């Protein structure tokens, strides 16, 4: 009887230790912290990639980073699959939030920006972020909170 209780307790501990890890991720998604990640090799523009991620699972979006450890995890997943390439991440229209000024200190009032939106792609080898035309096509990573 004691072995049965001890064995049952051991299984309960094992089950609880798996909660919040890969056991909660959809199949073929990878887990890190409380999130699931999936690398998609097909190339899409930023808007289509974000829409594709949203269609995968409720709450899924293009990748966002919140720590250097998370970056290391994502690089470990993307680099072997995509080699030296860019992936779309969930940043776009970064210039709209900036207060720009000229080198002489005056505020930017007149501008001649292109109508093309700028989105951010991360380089798989070193996670450097690059602005790219949102209409370009790249692979991407979807992220899902579990």
From Swiss-Prot:
Cellular component, GO annotation: extracellular region
Assembly and binders: Heterodimer of subunits alpha and beta; disulfide-linked.
Name of the protein in question: Snaclec alboaggregin-B subunit beta
Example of a GO MF term: toxin activity
Tissue and organ expression note: Expressed by the venom gland.
Pfam family, one: Lectin_C
The organism's place on the tree of life at top rank: Eukaryota
Disulphide-bonded residues: 25-36, 53-142, 119-134
Function summary: Weakly agglutinates platelets at high doses by binding to GPIbalpha (GP1BA).
Residue ranges of every copy of the C-type lectin domain listed in the record: 24-143
Keyword Disulfide bond found: yes
N-terminal signal peptide: 1-23
Organism: Trimeresurus albolabris
Compartments where located: Secreted
Family, as annotated: Belongs to the snaclec family.
Family annotation (InterPro entries): C-type_lectin-like, C-type_lectin-like/link_sf, C-type_lectin/snaclec_domain, CTDL_fold
SUPFAM superfamilies (alphabetical): C-type lectin-like
Swiss-Prot/TrEMBL keywords: Disulfide bond, Hemostasis impairing toxin, Platelet aggregation activating toxin, Secreted, Signal, Toxin
More about this protein: Monoclonal antibodies to glycoprotein IIb/IIIa, to bovine vWF, and to bovine serum albumin did not show any effect on the binding of AL-B to platelets.
């Amino acid at each position: 009887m004691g072995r049965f209780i001890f064995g049952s307790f051991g299984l309960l501990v094992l089950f609880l230790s798996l909660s919040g890890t890969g056991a909660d991720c959809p199949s073929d998604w990878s887990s890190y912290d409380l999130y699931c990640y999936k690398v998609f090799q097909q190339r899409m523009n930023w808007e289509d990639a974000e829409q594709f991620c949203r269609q995968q699972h409720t709450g899924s979006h293009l990748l966002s980073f919140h720590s250097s450890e998370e970056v290391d995890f994502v690089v470990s997943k993307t680099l072997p699959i995509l080699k030296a390439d860019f992936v779309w991440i969930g940043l776009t229209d970064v210039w709209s939030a900036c207060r720009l000024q000229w080198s002489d200190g005056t505020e930017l009032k007149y501008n001649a920006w292109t109508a093309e939106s700028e989105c951010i792609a991360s380089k798989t080898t070193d996670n450097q972020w690059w602005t790219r035309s949102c209409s370009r096509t790249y692979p991407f990573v979807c992220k899902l909170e579990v």
